């Protein structure tokens, strides 16, 4: 077993070796290095063929038409293109959007920008299980609502929203529905032929593909129109200009092909690893699981260890790569906005650690990690006066701390 142990698969995943090999074949002079937009020679034709094959592979995983897949630089760009693209194109119909308080920053910062441009946005508060229900969305819908944007799987707590039910509601009201699917590909079945989803964002690097490449599903029936945010040579039917990165696109295609083939077996294995880890830590006192216990992916365990400061615990677990909150925002010392939205107090939000498991996690690593967590939590609590007071039966929430 090699240290440190990687338990941060929701931040990024290593590229599967099978994917890396396919990518290498598209880089050098011996390989498929041409520009897919070069129509006048075989180098361009071969590159275009590889790109279209990858488009089919991505579409196959989510049961879409390949013509509905638009290449982007990642899920952040896909979210921007979907939300801004719809808002700007349909602004004459209405200027109201709906999203939730627990979305990824790539959605929340995009809607904040639209607010500065004069759009109105309703931010739905989830239940304490972290889920967004159709009833919550129905209560927020207005006559001038043009778009609802709700994530499929939450990046911090791993909860799965019922996008099928939400889609039925939005379609019946004639409102477009965008789903951030960055964390769900390869973890949850996605069937866009039956889901009433108009736009869906995908990322390669959360699914054992390379960073810097993603895709946006744009429905053809019913047809969704977008205003482009990237202008240039008119690539991707004018929706996203820029020379296509053949090697990254081929990598994403291969990663999604593997995900389709191996997802069922992989989910069973990862559920067993997650259960194995939890069984070894669940007897720790004052341990809380963040998010729904049932509607969640097995890959994610977000735990709060009360009376232990999350950052101290991360430092104590120096052989484990884990995170507090999302990788994109964990540099700030603010408590996780996702956990605050669930109604967790500052102390519990600050004591949370996200453990995420993946394709290359082993039982040996899981056992070692669980043992280290138990040791570190127990040791840090012996150093905490608050823990002593709690053990003595003092209700810490009732204490009035005097300022000096």
Swiss-Prot record:
Keyword Metal-binding tagged: yes
Keywords: 2Fe-2S, Cytoplasm, Iron, Iron-sulfur, Metal-binding, Pyridoxal phosphate, Transferase
GO biological process: [2Fe-2S] cluster assembly
Location of the active site: 328 (cysteine persulfide intermediate)
Family to which this protein belongs: Belongs to the class-V pyridoxal-phosphate-dependent aminotransferase family. NifS/IscS subfamily.
NCBIfam families, A to Z: IscS, PRK14012.1
HAMAP family attached to this UniProt entry: Cys_desulf_IscS
Protein name in UniProt: Cysteine desulfurase IscS
């Amino acid at each position: 077993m090699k240290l440190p142990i990687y338990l941060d698969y929701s931040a990024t995943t290593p590229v599967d070796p099978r994917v890396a090999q396919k990518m290498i074949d598209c880089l050098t002079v011996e390989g498929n290095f041409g520009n897919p937009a070069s129509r006048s020679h075989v180098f361009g034709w071969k590159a275009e063929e590889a790109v279209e094959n990858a488009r089919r592979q991505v579409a196959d995983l989510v049961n879409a038409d390949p013509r509905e897949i638009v290449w982007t630089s990642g899920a952040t760009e896909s979210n921007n293109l979907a939300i801004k693209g719809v808002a700007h194109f349909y602004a004459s119909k209405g200027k109201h959007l709906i999203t939730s308080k627990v979305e990824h920053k790539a959605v929340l910062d995009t809607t904040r920008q639209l607010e500065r441009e004069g759009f109105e946005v309703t931010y739905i508060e989830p239940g304490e299980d972290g889920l967004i229900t159709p009833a919550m969305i129905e209560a927020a819908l207005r006559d001038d609502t043009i778009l609802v944007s709700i994530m499929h799987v939450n990046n911090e707590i791993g909860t799965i929203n019922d996008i099928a039910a939400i889609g039925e509601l939005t379609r019946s009201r004639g409102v477009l529905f965008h789903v951030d699917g960055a964390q769900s590909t390869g973890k949850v079945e996605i069937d866009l032929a039956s889901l009433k989803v108009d736009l869906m964002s995908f990322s390669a690097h959360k699914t054992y593909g390379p960073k810097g490449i993603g895709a946006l599903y744009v429905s053809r029936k019913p047809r969704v129109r977008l205003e482009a945010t990237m202008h240039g040579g008119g690539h991707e039917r004018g929706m996203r200009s820029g020379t296509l990165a053949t090697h990254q696109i081929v990598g994403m295609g291969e990663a999604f092909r593997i995900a389709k083939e191996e997802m069922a077996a992989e989910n069973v294995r990862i559920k067993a690893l997650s259960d194995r880890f939890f069984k070894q830590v669940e007897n720790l006192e004052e341990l809380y699981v963040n998010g729904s216990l049932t509607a969640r992916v097995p890959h994610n365990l977000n735990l709060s260890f009360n009376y232990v400061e999350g950052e101290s615990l991360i430092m104590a677990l120096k052989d484990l790569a884990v995170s507090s909150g999302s990788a994109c925002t964990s540099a700030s010392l603010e408590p996780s906005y996702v956990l605050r939205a669930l109604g967790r107090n500052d102390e519990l939000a600050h004591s949370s650690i996200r453990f995420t498991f993946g394709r290359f996690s082993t039982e040996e690593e899981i056992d070692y990690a669980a043992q280290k967590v138990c040791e570190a939590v127990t040791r840090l609590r012996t150093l905490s006066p608050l823990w002593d007071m709690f053990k003595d039966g003092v209700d810490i929430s009732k204490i009035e701390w005097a300022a000096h």
